[in-house]
Structure formats: C-alpha cells, structure tokens
Amino acid sequence: MNSTSRRSANYKPTIWNNEYLQSLNSIYGEKRFLEQAEKLKDEVRMLLEKTSDPLDHIELVDVLQRLAISYHFTEYIDRNLKNIYDILIDGRRWNHADNLHATTLSFRLLRQHGYQVSPEVFRNFMDETGNFKKNLCDDIKGLLSLYEASYLLTEGETIMDSAQAFATHHLKQKLEENMNKNLGDEIAHALELPLHWRVPKLDVRWSIDAYERRQDMNPLLLELAKLDFNIAQSMYQDELKELSRWYSKTHLPEKLAFARDRLVESYLWGLGLASEPHHKYCRMMVAQSTTLISIIDDIYDVYGTLDELQLFTHAVDRWDIKYLEQLPEYMQICFLALFNTVNERSYDFLLDKGFNVIPHSSYRWAELCKTYLIEANWYHSGYKPSLNEYLNQGLISVAGPHALSHTYLCMTDSLKEKHILDLRTNPPVIKWVSILVRLADDLGTSTDELKRGDNPKSIQCHMHDTGCNEEETRAYIKNLIGSTWKKINKDVLMNFEYSMDFRTAAMNGARVSQFMYQYDDDGHGVPEGKSKERVCSLIVEPIPLP
C-alpha cells in the first residue's frame, strides 16, 4: 500500500476549522430581535396594502425579491402578479403601456413566477423594421429593466435576443459616460451577471447597500431587510456548527488529508439552493453531500489507483458494509462515513415523512461513483472524449442529478415512487441545470485541474474537437451557458409538473455555480480570496444596525 505511487493535488487546508466555527456567535437569534422582525413585517404588510398603483406594486415586488425578504410576503406577491397578468393578457387599460421600465419589469417578474407572457408585449417599443427604437437609449432605467427581462428568454424568441443585444450595447456605452456613481455601479453589476442568473440571498449584501443609496429608498423595507439578514445569519451559524460537529466526528479531514476539506464552501451550495428558514433539512443534506462528494471526487481524480476505484465503486453500488474488507484503509473510512451519514439522514427522513429514501439515495451515490470511474478510465487510458461525450458524463460527475434529486425529496410533500424513479432518467429539469453547473465549474477550475493531471474538461474537449485556441473556446463555452439558460427557462421554470419551490431550487443550483465560479476561478476548491470574502459577508459578519 505504502509503495503505491500516488498523485497529489496539493490542496490548501481549510481556513474554517471546527474551533473557529464553534466560536461563531450572534445576538440576532434572541427573542427580542425575532419579535422586532415580526413587528416590522406587520408594518410592511400595512404599507403594501395601502399601495394602489400597479407600477408601485410591481416595483415593491422587485425590491422585496432583491432584498431577499419576499418569502415573508408571498400572498401579496402572488395576488398582485396575477392582477398584472390579467391586465396584460386581457388588454385592459393600463396607464403604463408606453413605459419601457414598467412593461419590462412586469414581463420579468411574471415569467419568473411561471406566467407565460409573450415577448409581443415589447412590440410597442420597436419600429417598423423590427428594431428597438433609438430614442430608448436615453431611458437608462428602462434599458436596465429591458436588459434584466431579456434573460428570461427561451429558444427561438428573437425579440428577446434583440432586446438583450440592444440593451447590453447601450448600457456599455452609458458606462463610458460621466454619470451618477450609484447608477454606474448598478449598470456594472448587471452587466457582470444579470439578475436572473443570481441567487438573491447570495447577492443580498450588495443589494441592501445599493438600495440604501437610492433616493426612493423606503426606510421600513431597509430596516426589515437588514434585520432579517442578521437573523438568518444567526440561523446559518447554528447550522454550520452542527455540520462541523458531524464532520469532526467522521475524522475525514485528518484521515484523508490528501482531499479537499471544504465543509463551509459546501454549505454555501446548500444555502444558495434553499435559503429560507423552513428548508433547513435541505441545506444540511446538500452541505453534507457536497462535502463528501468533494472528498470522493479527489479519491477518483487524484489519489486512488484504478484497481482501488473499481472496488470502491462496487461497494457503493452494492451498498453493503460486507464489502468493507476488500477496500484499503483510507477507502474503508470514507465508505463507512458515507454509509453512516446517508443511512442516518434517511432515518430522519423516514421519521419525518414516512418514506424510505435509502434505495433512491444509494442509487445516486452509485451513479456518481460509476461516472467517476468512467472518467478515471479515460485518464488512465489517455482517452480524449468529444465535448458531447464529455458532457453526457460530466453532467452526472458534477453531481447535479445527485443534488437535485435529493432536493426534490426534501421539497415534495407527497412523494410517489413513480415520480422519483422518473427522475433517474435525468429529465430536462435535471439535465440542463447539471450541464450549466458543469460548464461553469469547468470555466473556473479547468486550468488548475489540468496542472494536477486531471481529465480534460469541456474547454480542452472543445479545443481538441475544433482546433480553437483557449480564448475562443472560453467564449464558446460562455455562449453555451447562455443557450443552456434558454433551455432552463423553458424546461425548468415553465415546467409545471414540479412545485415552484423545487423549480426555484433547481435554477438556484445553476445560479450558485455561476456565483462560485464567477470570476473564472475556483470558489469551491480555493478557500482564500473571493471565497473567504463571501463566507465572511454571508455567514460571519452581521450588517451593522443603529
């Protein structure tokens, strides 16, 4: 065993050890702050009910979502969006029909909530040649709203393609002009990543700061947003402490020191998928799974021999501890930690929902390991897959189907065996999100992974397929991400076979990947830099209150 030649990825150690995580403390879980938040929510409800103009309503909905407090006011939001939808569809008189901002904001919010609204509502802003009118260039607020709305497009919607190109071009031009700093910051933030591609909770510190600088800022909404953020942060800290205690008991960080120790970064994935308080179980499940996936991925990618990997894959596929004796010691530790964690979590699930998820959970772990083994065989044989062949495996090895199928189990009240089995085919609701996660991951990690000697990723596969250079290929992959979002908008957002909670979580999976790998770096694997800033902002540092 000791004489076996093994590769090393030289991963940096975690900067979030158990001692530090257990020391996290927040006063915002105290009863006085919870009572204050309830009082503020009642005052906001009164404010919302006093609002009469449809445009004021949709702007309030937008603000509530950006400030990540919309989950407190779902009844109000649902009622008012239905009213706006009825106005647009029935052709009833609306005083804002010529208002680009009002029309595009309504379109975006309605589509975001699953309403099927035609892009024809934008015809009023186009000339006889089918182009957007040039006089719209000076309407910066309208341009920003048009830009954000254009990312709700689906395949074949040429009006929306034109809207996106038009708005992007003119917003970039506006940035070069001498303009108000707050407005310039808002444009730059939008051009960096559109709102539809962001998770509101992961972006909320920026949104709160931006809202506070607005001239039309409502102090009541701002106060609630800050307090709600701090209360949620207190809850997230408690969850991380619980996760850290679990992780310490597994002894995986010290026993498998060659692998990534990324508990906190894994928790960010769970937080991004489902940030609301009532989705705690989902967050914890995703965090535990992602932590274990990172370790197992490193076993297959870097440390394990091909013979060992075949034995480990077989043990996971059989889901039986009698195969433990066949494994080397480091794999025994990993397999038993996986086996116990999944079974304990499934026991809690059985008590809560009366449903045995072990067969479905173990299936996804086996599927993941079998795919890792295929990719390991590619590496050891020197095989170079085409981009399509790579993505067919890569959508599984990035663990999208694993995370989304478990999220479905958590978010579905009345579980049916048939529906869960249907998910095993990785239908579009899972496929497109997983492909997007794979592409975003590869943009951020492929350079470092190739230095370690890992398999070629999507960038290298496309370069090998086409002869393009890396810069051209990165541009191609970014365009592929855009076209994949069109599929997500149709096959996930508008797929009414699934609950809105699950559809939102699925899209959040795509969004978190772009958050983690936003700057073409590895926000999951590299603990310093942007990753550290994000953890501090979301989980460690509260927003100062007066």
From Swiss-Prot:
Superkingdom in the source lineage: Eukaryota
InterPro entries attached to this UniProt entry: Isoprenoid_synthase_dom_sf, Terpene_cyclase-like_1_C, Terpene_cyclase_plant_C1, Terpene_synth_N, Terpene_synth_N_sf, Terpene_synthase-like, Terpene_synthase_metal-bd, Terpenoid_cyclase/PrenylTrfase
Catalytic activity: (2E,6E)-farnesyl diphosphate + H2O = (+)-epi-alpha-bisabolol + diphosphate
Binding-site residues, Mg(2+) 2: D297, D301
Binding site for Mg(2+) 1: D297, D301
Record note on cofactor: Binds 3 Mg(2+) ions per subunit.
CDD domains, per database record: Terpene_cyclase_plant_C1
Transmembrane segments: none
Swiss-Prot/TrEMBL cofactor(s): Mg(2+)
GO biological-process terms attached to the record: (+)-epi-alpha-bisabolol biosynthetic process; diterpenoid biosynthetic process; farnesyl diphosphate catabolic process
Sequence motif DDXXD motif, residues: 297-301
GO function terms (MF aspect): magnesium ion binding; sesquiterpene synthase activity
UniProt note: domains: The Asp-Asp-Xaa-Xaa-Asp/Glu (DDXXD/E) motif is important for the catalytic activity, presumably through binding to Mg(2+).
Family named by the database record: Belongs to the terpene synthase family.
Protein name: (+)-epi-alpha-bisabolol synthase
